[in-house]
Each structure stands twice: as structure tokens, then as C-alpha cells.
């Protein structure tokens, strides 16, 4: 069967593979389009295996929130270069992986198949990274923020007491701003009572020993350490942080103001923040 230019064009549109690869696939498969698609996929899988040892230090964090704000997911999709991370197909796949995490709780085999397909198309090693699912039972809403470069993504569970509040524009804007706060300020916990006690003890001991080394009197060392811990809370606890859009207001005060505006009692239950590469940095620090 003669392979025409229109057949090559059609296969390219379906697979985004190179023109010569498409022509060869059609020749190998007797001009049968579906078989040619599979042939290219198989070739892509072979390429993927060869590329599997290459580092995937670039990529994106995919973010998905359901229309009702009750279910959400984050998913890292890694690649080798920043150029590929900005490719439309790569960005689209990151979003689809996040949606699968939101609806199923984890990535399944179809996710790896999709990744292998895009490896064949774009010619770089890729892989999935961390994932996180968030669900809201009852009233409330999941706010989200995805940084413009796709390297930082946040989910935050906002609480309220009235079902109608979750549809209020003022409440939704507050949820978005709190998520943006988390992205920018990287808090360790929502509030002081949710900070890991071991972290608090470590901070207290660091400042206590520092005060002793500076020759401070023993009777004020504890006060110095406690003062330092309070300062630490203002930096590490979301509710105590200065609001990024008005540093004279804390996030807790923002919630109070918004609560009054919507006639409800608002709060933050939890959050998840992913920054691409931070897991690798943590592993290096632990070595």
C-alpha cells in the first residue's frame, strides 16, 4: 500500500511523533493507522526504557479541585528540562494526574501508560512524584493556588458552619488568598498547637544554648528561649503569620474579618503544599 502525505500528517496529529517516524510506522504496518499508532507507542516505550536512568529534576505540580470544592488532588510530574515542563501536552498531563489522585486517591497503571506515551512524543525521561488527596466531609471548601510557573501548588481545607457560605464570593476569595499565603510563606502548621512538639523543643533548646553561650544570666535564659519560640510561631504558624497582602493584619485576623463579612465562623483545618524538588532536597540533607 502506498503511504501518502495525508496519512503521515494524520498519524503525526494523533501521536505528535516525527514525520520520518510516522512514515516508517505506516510502512511497517501496511498503512493501517491504528497499528501504526501502536508501533510508535511501542517504539516510544523502548525509548523510555533507554532514558529511564536520566535525572528528572524539572517538571510541574499538577493541581485539581472538583467543581463543588469537596475533592482535590496534587501530583508531581517530573522531566529533564524546563523546556519540556512548559510543553502544552506535559502541562495537560500533570493536571490529569492530579485529577486521578483526587478521584481515586492514587495513580494507577493508566497514569504510567500516559507518561510512557508522552515520553515517546517529547523524547525525555519523565516520572510521577509525590501525590496528595484532600476530601471535605460536610461543610467547607478546598481552596487552591498554583504558582504561575507550576513549581508550587497548595490545597487548603477551609471550614465553615453554613452550607451557603461555600458559595459566597467573599469566602472563595479568602480561600484563594489563604492558599496564596501558604505558597508564599511556607508555614509548618496551621496553628501553634499543631506544630510538632519535637520541633518546638528543638527550637527552644537552640535558643537556650545560644543564650548561655552569649553569657546571659541563667535566670533569664528561659525567658529568652520562650521569646524566641513565640517569634518562631509567628513565622511557622499560618494563623500567626502577617498576611502577605497587608502585613499589619495576621491570617487569623483575616479569617475573623471574613467571618464577619459572610456571617459565619470560618477556619483552616489543614493544608498541603508541594514545591517541586523539595523532596529531593530533603533526601540530600538527610544523607
From Swiss-Prot:
Name of the protein in its database record: Elongation factor Ts
Compartmental location: Cytoplasm
Gene this protein is translated from: tsf
Protein task: Associates with the EF-Tu.GDP complex and induces the exchange of GDP to GTP. It remains bound to the aminoacyl-tRNA.EF-Tu.GTP complex up to the GTP hydrolysis stage on the ribosome.
Keywords: Cytoplasm, Elongation factor, Protein biosynthesis
Alphabetical list of Pfam families matching this protein: EF_TS
SUPFAM superfamilies: Elongation factor Ts (EF-Ts), dimerisation domain, UBA-like
Organism, scientific name: Nitratidesulfovibrio vulgaris (strain ATCC 29579 / DSM 644 / CCUG 34227 / NCIMB 8303 / VKM B-1760 / Hildenborough) (Desulfovibrio vulgaris)
Listed GO MF terms: translation elongation factor activity
InterPro entries from the UniProt entry: EF-Ts_dimer_sf (IPR036402), Transl_elong_EFTs/EF1B (IPR001816), Transl_elong_EFTs/EF1B_dimer (IPR014039), Transl_elong_Ts_CS (IPR018101), UBA-like_sf (IPR009060)
PANTHER family per record: ELONGATION FACTOR TS, ELONGATION FACTOR TS, MITOCHONDRIAL
One GO term describing the cellular component: cytoplasm
Highest taxon listed in the record's lineage: Bacteria
CDD domains in the record: UBA_EF-Ts
Protein family membership: Belongs to the EF-Ts family.
Segments traversing the membrane: none
Involved in Mg(2+) ion dislocation from EF-Tu as annotated region, ranges: 81-84
Amino acid at each position: 500500500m502506498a503511504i501518502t502525505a495525508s496519512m503521515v500528517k494524520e498519524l503525526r496529529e494523533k501521536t505528535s511523533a516525527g514525520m520520518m517516524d510516522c512514515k516508517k510506522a505506516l510502512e511497517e504496518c501496511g498503512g493501517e493507522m491504528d497499528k501504526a499508532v501502536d508501533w510508535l507507542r511501542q517504539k516510544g516505550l523502548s525509548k523510555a526504557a533507554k532514558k529511564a536512568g536520566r535525572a528528572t529534576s524539572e517538571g510541574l505540580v499538577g493541581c485539581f479541585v472538583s467543581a463543588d470544592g469537596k475533592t482535590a488532588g496534587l501530583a508531581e510530574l517530573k522531566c529533564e528540562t524546563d523546556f519540556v515542563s512548559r510543553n502544552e501536552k506535559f502541562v495537560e498531563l500533570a493536571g490529569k494526574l492530579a485529577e486521578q489522585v483526587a478521584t481515586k486517591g492514587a495513580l494507577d497503571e493508566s497514569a504510567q501508560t500516559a507518561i510512557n506515551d508522552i515520553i515517546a512524543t517529547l523524547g525525555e525521561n519523565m516520572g510521577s512524584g509525590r501525590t496528595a488527596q484532600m476530601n471535605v466531609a460536610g461543610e467547607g471548601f478546598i481552596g487552591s493556588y498554583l504558582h504561575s510557573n507550576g513549581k508550587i501548588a497548595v490545597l487548603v481545607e477551609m471550614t465553615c458552619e453554613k452550607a451557603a457560605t461555600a458559595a459566597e464570593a467573599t469566602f472563595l476569595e479568602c480561600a484563594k488568598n489563604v492558599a496564596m499565603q501558604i505558597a508564599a510563606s511556607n508555614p509548618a502548621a496551621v496553628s501553634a498547637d499543631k506544630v510538632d512538639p519535637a520541633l518546638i523543643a528543638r527550637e527552644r533548646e537552640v535558643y537556650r544554648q545560644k543564650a548561655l553561650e552569649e553569657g546571659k544570666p541563667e535566670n533569664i535564659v528561659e525567658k529568652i528561649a520562650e521569646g524566641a519560640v513565640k517569634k518562631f510561631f509567628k513565622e511557622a504558624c499560618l494563623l500567626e503569620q502577617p498576611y502577605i497582602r497587608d502585613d499589619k493584619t495576621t491570617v487569623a485576623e483575616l479569617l475573623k474579618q471574613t467571618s464577619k463579612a459572610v456571617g459565619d465562623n470560618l477556619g483552616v483545618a489543614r493544608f498541603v503544599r508541594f514545591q517541586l524538588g523539595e523532596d529531593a532536597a530533603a533526601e540530600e540533607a538527610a544523607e
